[in-house]
């Protein structure tokens, strides 16, 4: 079977854009097979397999769980004719052919605002808040090291300065993701 490997950058806030990308690829004759970390820093490795072009709905669900809950979780989606593709970074990837969709409500896993809002809240609580807490602890510590690095010479000053710079870049990226998720949460809360 012919394979295609694509490297893309999607943040956890871009899960809807990611599903649209998979839908477009499937319509061109490439179905998603696997999602992995890549050797590239921020990009994710997507493996596609050649298939007949068709209209397919892709959905992602962020639902970290115990292994004991996994079989029940997957069976729920199987009962609703959603094919489980793979799991990556606590996201489960599903697809369903449009020919198997009987109503508009079946195009999405969460077809109501409450379900979508619950998923966004899980992402915020389990992914974004821990990273922000670590950065909140790490950055002041680095500034304290910067004050002391003068005693250790130029190289330690440069190392601490670079660490501060990279931490601030990471803070900007995480803040941008948080901003997108916060707006998504607000939009869903208003429905």
State where each predicted segment sits:
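Terminus-proximal functional modules
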Residues: 1-191
């Amino acid at each position: 079977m012919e394979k295609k490997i694509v490297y893309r950058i999607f943040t956890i806030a871009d899960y809807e854009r990611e599903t649209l990308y998979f839908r477009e690829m499937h319509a061109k004759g490439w179905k998603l097979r696997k999602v992995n970390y890549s050797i590239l820093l921020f990009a994710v490795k997507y493996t596609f397999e050649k298939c007949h072009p068709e209209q397919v709905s892709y959905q992602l669900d962020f639902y970290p769980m115990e292994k004991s809950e996994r079989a029940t979780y997957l069976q729920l989606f199987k009962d609703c004719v959603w094919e489980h593709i793979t799991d990556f970074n606590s996201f489960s990837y599903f697809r369903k052919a449009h020919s198997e969709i009987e109503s508009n409500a079946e195009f999405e896993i969460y077809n109501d605002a409450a379900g979508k809002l619950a998923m966004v809240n899980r992402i915020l609580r389990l992914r974004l808040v821990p990273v922000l807490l670590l950065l909140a602890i790490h950055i002041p510590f680095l500034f304290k090291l910067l004050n002391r690095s003068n005693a250790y010479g130029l190289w330690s000053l440069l190392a601490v300065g670079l660490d501060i710079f990279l931490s601030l870049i990471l803070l900007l990226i995480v803040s941008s993701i948080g901003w997108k998720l916060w707006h998504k949460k607000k939009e869903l809360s208003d429905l």
